């Protein structure tokens, strides 16, 4: 996952919004020098120093008069670009090499090996997955596609239903901790950004793979490049029988879905414009996903479209973006049978418009931005009663309820640098039409100090808020009781850390403290008729503390006489949460967090063109659940071993892989067992046109 020869890599200067494979941070106007960090280091990439004003970046810089060799790549990671040596933000990067080495069939599988990320799956190959950061849940993380927020205000359960096949992903970037002034207020515990490939030539590529449990996946894509315009178009289909059956012997964890995605780019010296559109459609068995029924089913259909631009000349740089996301969901308590419980239909339309800018003056670099985002949901039962029902296409029913809310935010940030010291500080001011509140301001400040050419200390304070999802406000179904008077969650966080980075060794450690107020979750209550229900509430205050550590060894650098072992990486994270006024609450999400998480990855190259990866991850989850025998049960710790063997040629790649080699039985959610041993094999092909 790391480059084999670090000292031969040169730093590349990605001009802000140039036609390159960079990320969230380029879209947002942030800049940081990022090493190609392995996911298993579970650590963060930090900024190093290269002048942003240079037309090209050299692979060296001066530190107190000493020439220092760099082995990192320049991308963006602050509201306005600045000299990368002045940067203070931290980001974890899953590179294209990481994606190729990991035995994964979805973005969710990739994230399982990242420190501080909790991936809780309810079904195979990403059918339905909740992703949290540093003890947070699926509602408290922002997911972005090429820098555009694609979160679903209905529920975080469907957030990671993205229209991108794994083969079209260039990289994934992860920032942890609240940072409203960078990503907007929904990023309570952090943000994950998926960056897609852009066309660099005219080519045709395809893939096919198959495996256990009736798994089959195939896809095709085409890239074109002519002058300043490039286009990328792809589509894929995936299905599986699943790995369990209901009481009648029918499959109840099956999956079937398709994706299509298009991206275009126009890039000149004066202007860069990007646009994309995507579709995702899938249906999956939902055995015990949301309640005590082994025959549940869900279908989701999503569309995404956006246009982004940046001016490259003038004293003030402008970066506008406009987007529209539509999410449609049909939930069936009894599969294909709308009795005795009717199907639950929901449709959400999200419209967004933002404008960011930055300029230089004698005191540093200042960035200003504003965004307006409208969320409109119509539903068969969630929300307030509509004055005029809206027909549900393809059915004899109407949307009878709904909710519409608009969020307006303003951002200001300033960056300055003095010798080895760097600082970035600012705030976001936000107001939501749904919440009964005045405009609120959430500040943040990031500091860093370079101790030596290879090491740096950093510290940060950040804050943000999150509006309740529509599900938390209005979901009333079997065993669930909503609360439309929920208050927004608010989080403030402190973090300090240290990083050492040389050609052969990388080591990182981070300590953090989170203070969460008005925490929203579903807690178990007993009704007057002695029935258990899950009630959505604001309860108590959570104080959490944690540590993240990671070590990466480039074995080809440390032991140059051998060529079999490429690298070894190990990482560990620990989180402890304390809930004030906790009276033995059984929580649905928040209190079921990972106390311990560890992973290790060994990369090998047995012979030329053959790579072999062995990956192990350990998880120990806090919290309890009520099993099918009505007994309160604690989650048990578990370890999973995965492997992948790949043979690569310029025009094709062949692989075999296995997940859960030891066939462990484990749960991410109560009563929803995860698959045992799973074998897959496949091939991909690439033809230059």
Question: Where are the language model's segments positioned?
Answer:
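Flexible loop and strand-edge segments within Gram-negative outer membrane beta-barrel domains
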Residues: 240-257, 271-350
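Outer-membrane beta-barrel signature, preferentially recognizing the C-terminal barrel domain
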Residues: 291-313, 346-348, 436, 450, ...
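Extracytoplasmic beta-strand/coil segments of soluble accessory domains associated
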Residues: 108, 112-148, 152, 170
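Gram-negative outer-membrane beta-barrel transporters
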Residues: 417-422, 513-515, 535-624, 684
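Short strand-turn segments of transmembrane beta-barrel domains in outer membranes
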Residues: 191, 196-224, 235, 250-254
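Short acidic/polar hinge/loop motifs at secondary-structure boundaries
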Residues: 149-176
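A beta-strand signature from Gram-negative outer-membrane beta-barrel systems
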Residues: 166-203, 554, 559
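Short, acidic, small-residue-rich periplasmic hinge/interaction motif at the N-terminus
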Residues: 49-100, 108, 138, 312
